[in-house]
From Swiss-Prot:
It comes from Thermosynechococcus vestitus (strain NIES-2133 / IAM M-273 / BP-1). This is Cytochrome b6-f complex subunit 8. It holds the Pfam family PetN. Keywords: Electron transport, Membrane, Photosynthesis, Thylakoid, Transmembrane, Transmembrane helix, Transport. It is found in: Cellular thylakoid membrane. GO terms for biological process: cytochrome complex assembly; photosynthesis.
């Protein structure tokens, strides 16, 4: 696994987590 692939996976996971937290926050959870 290259560093570029690892970097992309990290960016995507952080982005997905931030979206999930925003959605949860809007639903009052």
């Amino acid at each position: 696994m290259d560093i570029i692939t690892l970097g992309w996976v990290g960016v995507l996971s952080v982005f997905t987590l931030s979206i999930a937290f925003v959605v949860w926050g809007r639903h009052g959870m």
